[in-house]
């Protein structure tokens, strides 16, 4: 029924005549979920600690899980269960009568969380510009003890906090067990971890794999706590890591088809798709950087699978994304970011004034090369003959207008802003190569005034640019410091936002709503597998 609703949606609004068929293809590639039953490994107690990440840590409690699960419940008690790993799925609470019989409902507040501070920071007054509804706390009224209660809401996290809000004194009952049905479509890892990794890199590798595994559901989600949806930019990075881990290419195919089928009225990809109750796009979310990364995902999918039928089927979508991007390019071969109202996302540092014009110029050049490569593999270069010439002219225009030969860096926008992202994308696009690339990256990274990356997403591209520029020792050090910093601060899965110098950084103005298991942060596996000689 839901799939039908979705098909109806595309039939009535589709830009591409094959959209309804594409949606069926997406359904046909939907993976099954694997289930793992998890139980808590220990009880923990929170401690405010300004040396801990975001000011809170958990210590082992002297009470065992079985002692906690036989304690008569009384209002005011708080139990915190530690499951020892990050999980995505469904929580079941079991209660058991210990003495006499139930004479009043039991009232509990349960909360799942990924990080200690998320469970211990007061949430009111709510400070984020995202909904309070993302927090995973629920009030339960249990009318019948001795019956399992399974929460219908899917949750994500490692810790479960149960507060007793109301319990009768005239009978005793205990929270006899808590279990968690953890789900993921990832399955077994198909690729072995390289043998020669240092202990620190091994730890980073493990956390990366866990991050991707948790985000692999019936789509690649960005974060299983939040936003629980499919974003094109996250998909690109996830698909790269999937190659070197679970190799579930059907999931990538499903996601490519969903974006194509649910494109906007003008054929551009909508940046993100919400899967439930039926797949639908977040109407109006037009983000050109992610439109173009969809092309790269299709190219990488083709390289991984050799599935030319799918790539041929979807080629027109890739071409449409490219045409749309080229419509912003003026006679001077500069991408005009003000031409239309569009979201150009490279990093959440956009809230701190990151200027994206130079990075967008470069991202367009990179996309032209990638789309041309796709056309070449599909025998369709005759349709895009002009691409290499445009890319060459855009490269020259970037050097002419944005490159400061004296300082050896790319400046962005009218204020001539210096940022690491501008250099990164210029290197990725081949606008800066060799010694010039090294100089630009080194200068921006060392300059305190330059805008540094604020997310693992942006950092991924920095590490990639370093490798491309031949700064291999620096790339290894940067990756180890950045992702290793999260591991040292207790990450079981990698976080959405991370600044080594600011544990409270939040793109949403309130850190508890940040996602601590975030797709775009899982890429160390990609680097360690793709460049074994660099990361060992
Ligand atoms: C965030 C999402 C996602 C990202 C977009 C731009 O809210 O979590 O990961 O791709 O924004």
Say what each PLM segment does.
Residues 231-536:
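Active-site core of glycosidic bond-cleaving carbohydrate-active enzymes
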Residues 3-11:
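Sec-dependent N-terminal signal peptides
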Residues 228:
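Active-site lumenal/periplasmic loops and adjacent helix-entry segments of GT-C-fold
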Residues 11-222, 250, 270-275:
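Extracellular/oxidizing-compartment recognition motifs
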Residues 6, 113-115, 419:
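Short linear Ser/Thr-Pro motifs
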């Amino acid at each position: 029924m839901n799939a039908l609703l979705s098909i109806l949606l595309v039939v009535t609004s589709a830009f591409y005549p094959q959209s309804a068929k594409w949606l069926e293809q997406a359904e046909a590639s939907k993976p099954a979920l694997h289930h793992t039953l998890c139980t808590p490994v220990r009880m923990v107690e929170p401690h405010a600690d300004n040396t801990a990440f975001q000011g809170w840590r958990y210590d082992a409690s002297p009470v065992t899980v079985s002692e906690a699960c036989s304690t008569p419940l009384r209002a005011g008690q708080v139990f915190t269960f530690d499951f020892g790993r990050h999980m995505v799925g469904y929580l079941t609470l079991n209660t058991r009568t210990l003495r006499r019989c139930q004479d009043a409902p039991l009232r509990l507040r349960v909360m799942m969380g990924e990080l200690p501070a998320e469970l211990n920071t007061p949430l009111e007054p709510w400070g984020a510009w995202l909904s309070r509804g993302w927090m995973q706390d629920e009030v339960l009224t249990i009318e019948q003890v001795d019956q399992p209660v399974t929460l219908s809401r899917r949750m994500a996290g490692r810790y479960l906090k149960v507060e007793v809000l109301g319990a009768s004194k005239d009978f005793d009952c205990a929270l006899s067990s808590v279990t968690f049905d953890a789900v993921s479509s990832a399955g077994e890892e198909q690729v072995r971890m390289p043998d020669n990794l240092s202990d620190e890199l091994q730890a980073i590798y493990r956390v990366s794999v866990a991050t991707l595994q948790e985000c692999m559901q019936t789509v690649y989600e960005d974060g299983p706590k939040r936003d629980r949806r499919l974003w094109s930019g996250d998909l690109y990075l996830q698909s790269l890591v999937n190659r070197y881990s679970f190799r579930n290419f059907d999931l990538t195919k499903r996601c490519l088809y969903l974006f194509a089928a649910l494109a906007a009225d003008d054929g551009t990809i909508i940046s993100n798709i919400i899967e439930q109750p039926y797949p639908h796009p977040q109407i109006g979310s037009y983000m050109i950087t992610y439109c173009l990364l969809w092309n790269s995902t299709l190219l990488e999918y083709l390289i991984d699978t050799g599935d030319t039928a799918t790539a041929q089927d979807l080629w027109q979508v890739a071409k449409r994304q490219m045409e749309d991007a080229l419509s912003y390019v003026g006679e001077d071969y500069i991408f005009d970011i003000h031409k239309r109202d569009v979201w150009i996302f490279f990093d959440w540092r956009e809230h701190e004034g990151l200027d994206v014009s130079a990075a967008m110029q470069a991202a367009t050049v990179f996309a032209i090369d990638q789309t041309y490569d796709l056309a070449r593999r599909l025998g369709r270069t005759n349709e895009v003959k002009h691409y290499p010439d445009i890319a060459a002219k855009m490269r020259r225009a970037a050097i002419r207008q944005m490159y400061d030969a004296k300082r050896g860096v790319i400046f962005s926008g009218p204020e001539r802003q210096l940022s690491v992202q501008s250099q990164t994308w210029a290197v990725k696009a081949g606008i800066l190569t060799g010694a010039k690339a090294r100089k630009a990256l080194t200068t921006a990274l060392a300059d305190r005034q330059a805008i540094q990356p604020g997310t693992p997403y942006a950092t991924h591209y920095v590490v990639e640019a370093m490798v491309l520029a031949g700064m291999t020792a620096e790339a290894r050090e940067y990756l180890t410091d950045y992702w290793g910093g999260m591991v040292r601060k207790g990450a079981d899965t990698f976080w959405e936002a991370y600044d080594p110098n600011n544990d409270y950084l939040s793109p949403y103005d309130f850190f508890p709503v940040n996602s601590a298991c975030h797709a775009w942060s899982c890429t160390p596996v990609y680097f360690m597998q793709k460049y074994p000689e660099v990361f060992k």
